[in-house]
């Protein structure tokens, strides 16, 4: 095998989190976009899901005149796309793909994945089918783009992140094999399930039967497409050595390489701007907490926080809250602590009473609302964070450790 390095002439990157912040992959892609765009310019194209039915997308700026003829040709084939720029540094070209036209064809597409790759979709529910249709549509769009704008001598590479986009790479392997495919998993489906169910993931990794456990945890479809993606993409990558070992045993293929996540040097502000932003953020966070809790901080609180996907155990939210409880119980604690938990959770929007009070402090706070949340929670009774805080010293009036839960957006966007 040749070790020669080749740079693609056309580079596509596909993720459910392009212009759609859900978790860390959004950060991974958005913070490298400036560097990639500097190298490839408009030969670098990002693809994400068109979720315009959920409201205006604040991260996307559409350009109705960009690639107009090509968009029309795709529309004639039954796929609608919007083309524009991602409003981040580098302003990369983005194609948002409306995959709704594929819904009537879902059985045909799932059948094709089974016949070509033995992807077992039979138990997959909508949270599986929806991203599979998006991934498939993204594959169709990439093939059309290369056919329209590429030349026979140009090298095209399509990079797919996570199982949610894997159908795109599998589509290209069959229908446009001249486009090289790369699949990156940031965390395996089964790894999340095993750890989330309190099984010793890393101690017993070689002993697990991933396919059998997938059936037990009812994630056969997601595990199956991830496993086949690892097997059938031209290159298989992951982001850490520990996840690479996970892939070896749970997906049956060792990754071809490990690409650690990186950030631009200007990922955070510097100098005076940093301190100004920091002070502004502190004031806002303290004001929101005081309004929610109906208590004033007596000094200068230490602000800590945790964020990420709402995986109570895997993301260490349980450990974070337990640590706060122990801190609150310590007689050595002298300084007040304000803890923010910002994770996506089902909600009906920000509290109106809180917004009104922050705009006009004479407006009262609704005493009937859950005081540790900034939003109206959908299922507060069953919420793990709410239940972990319930009847603990973290909810005691006058506790030196105060907790605010910010359900940043609905989990429905995955």
Predicted regions and their residues:
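Catalytic cores of nucleotide-sugar-dependent glycosyltransferases that transfer UDP/GDP/TDP-activated
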Residues: 1-414
